[in-house]
Structures are given as C-alpha cells and as structure tokens.
Amino acid sequence: MPQLPAWLEKYRMLPRRVLLFAAGQFLINLITSAQFLLLNLFLKDKGLGDPAIAALSSQRFVATFLLAIPAGLWLRGRPLRMPMFVGSILFPLTALASLEAVNAGMMSLASGCFLAMGFSGLLLNVGSLPMALRLTPPKQTSEALSLLFATWAGASICGGVLSSVLQGMGHLDIFGHHLVFDEYATLLVLTLAGFGAPFLYARLPDPVPEKKHVGHWLHVERRDWGLLTAALVPTICIATGAGLSIQFLNLFFSHVHQLSSASYSAYGSISNVLVLFAGLIVPEVKRRLGWRGAIFGVQTVAVMLLLTMGFTELWKTCGWALPVAVVCFILRQPLMSMAGPSTSELTMSYVGERNRELVSACNGAIWSGAWWLAARTFEILRTHHLPYWMVFLVTSILYLAGTFSYLLLIRTVERRRPDDADHAPISEPGHV
C-alpha cells in the first residue's frame, strides 16, 4: 500500500471522537450547503423577487443575532454535547418545515420556520469550535479545525453533484408517479440526509474544560473586554462584507450572466473540490508560511478575484465576461475558505480557553446580525437597481479591513511562548 504524504497522515492520527464529530458536521453541512447553493434559486422559481428573497432569507439570522451571546455566556464551562444533540435534531426538522411551507405557498408560516431554523442552528454554531477543541489534543488542533472546515466543502460537493445529476435527468416516471428533479428535490434529499447527525453526536464523549467559569454566568471579567473587542473586529468586517454579496452570488450569475442553476451547481462543485483540498493543506501552509501567509496572503488574493468577478458585469455582453467570472468564482472560494481554519485557531488562541464559548457565540451573533442587516441592505440596494459590481466593491473594502485587522492579532500571538499558544489568554490586550 502506498504511503500517505506526511501532511495527510496527520489526519489519520486524529482521535476517533474527532472523526465522529466531523462526520456529524458533514451531515449538518449537507443542509446548509444545499441552502447556500440552491435556496435562493428555489425561492426565485416560486415567484419571489430579489427583495422578497432577501427578506425571507434574513429571518434565519434574527434568532442567532438576539440569542447567541446569552447562549455563549451560559455555555461557558458547561458540557456541550446535549445542546449540540438537541440542535442536530431541531435543525433538520425546521429546515424541512421551511422547505415545505415555501413549496405550499404559505409564506407567513415559512417566515416563522426560517426563524426557528436560525435558533436551532444557533445551538450548533455556538458549541461547534469549543467542542472540537475539547475533543482534540492541543498538538492536533490545526488538523482538527481544518477537517471540520473541510466538511463544508465535502457537503457542498455532494450537493452540487446531486443537483447537477438530478436536474440533468429532469424528470422520471415510476409506477405511475411523475417525479420532477429540480431545486426543491435536491434540497429535500439533502435535508433528509441531515437527520443522521443526531446518531453521531449521541456517541460523543462530553468533556468539560479544566478551568471552569467562576462567578455568575452573565459576568465577563473587565480585562477580557478589550481582548474580546480586538478579536471580533475582523469578524465584523468580513461577515458584513460576505453578507452583502456572497449569499447572493447565485442571483448574480442568474441575473447578470443568465447562468442556469444546474451550471451554477456544477461550477460550485468544482470550486468546492478545490476548497476541500485547500482546507486539508492549511496546517502545512501555516507551518511553512506562518500566520501571515495562511491568512493575510490568501485572503488578499481572494479579494482581488472577487473584485474581478464583480467588474465582469460592466462587460457582460462580451464573450469573455462569463468565463472570467466563472474562473474567479471557482478560485475565490478556496482561497477565502482556506483562511477559515487559521483565523479560527488564531482567534481561539488569542482569547484563551475561558473565553472560547463566548467568542464562538459572539462570532455567531456577528455573522447572523451582519448577514441579516446585509440582506436587508441588499434588498434596498436592489430595489433601487444598484448594480452588483458596486455591491462587490463594498464587500472587497470590508474584506480588506478585516484582513488587516487580523495582522494585529497575529503580532500578539507570535509574541507569546509556543507552549502557551493554545490555552493561555492574553493578559495585556492593550499592546495589540
């Protein structure tokens, strides 16, 4: 049997509990990736315009925005398996209810289901990174986080391939039943697959941190406020930028370049193959290039690709515009996603063990709040017919601001002793 490369062999050495957790994440991500790829197109086929799609989609983020920080404060130092187990049951249920409500034309019910889906996703998102770090030996943190991020790419590949295959078939007659394979069918199949996640989460151990939170669960130590603020600034910038444009890329290709949902899914699958590979080599890239190369370098190139993709709208009648936009789309996501494991590890190292649940919750609140606000902003901008390229330009500016903010965290973490990098909090955030 041929020997695996050294960087890939490190994944084989991960504990079984980490692999179980990653498998559960993969099944949950089948739902979220399917929604990312196809939900807007499904809503468009149901007769909703861009503003209505943005308004309905934004409901997913309201619950997380309002409840994430209280949830993070309460979960500090507590067992995480039960909240994640409950979330893994509720998330597929509410996703299925949302899908069926839209399909039945019951938009008021759909709005409530989207809100409930956001709450159930909150339980999963707040505990995900802290749970992964509790399950993983410190020396294997980079590989564990990269594997978790790679589950998104793997789920997206499955969703894209399934969408392309089903929509390529179009329809099928079985025993007198006429089955139509469209965006709804793909969303339904992948949502049902997500019901396997609770069975995997139920088999996980339930470790608690060595240092439990002391004091009332709402209390945050005074010295931690500056630490938390510095850690969250990059997330605010990047989440707001992403919310303005990334969640609507499928609409950009549909409206500007008249790309079909099947073609978009196929290109998305190609991109996610690269995301999967790029995510797995993140630990090796970080070892060779350091934090700056793994975060600042790859994100800067990704921003340039996003700008180029947006500017193709100005020349959309030219034959080269669509190929250039597709190439930028395929390459941008792997590079931007490649920084994800590194930024998560950097942030968790920066804030220390006692603040991980709180930072994870704050990140969830920021992403949800930013995406909700950005979706509403996008709704207004598109109502006034602002072109997509201008939206992408704003996104790029915000991305660059967030990327440069990470440099401040990198400088602080690099000044610390390597032995303390995984667990010790920064005692002097004012030096950042």
Kindly label every feature range from the protein language model:
Residues I89-G105, V301-C318:
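C-terminal ends and interior cores of transmembrane alpha-helices
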Residues L67-L80, Q167, A278-W291, R382-T383:
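Helix-to-loop junctions at the C-terminal end of transmembrane segments
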Residues F26, M107-L124, I236, W320-M338:
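Hydrophobic core of transmembrane alpha-helices in multi-pass small-molecule transporters
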Residues G168-L192, I380-Y399:
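A membrane-interface helix-boundary motif in multi-pass transporters
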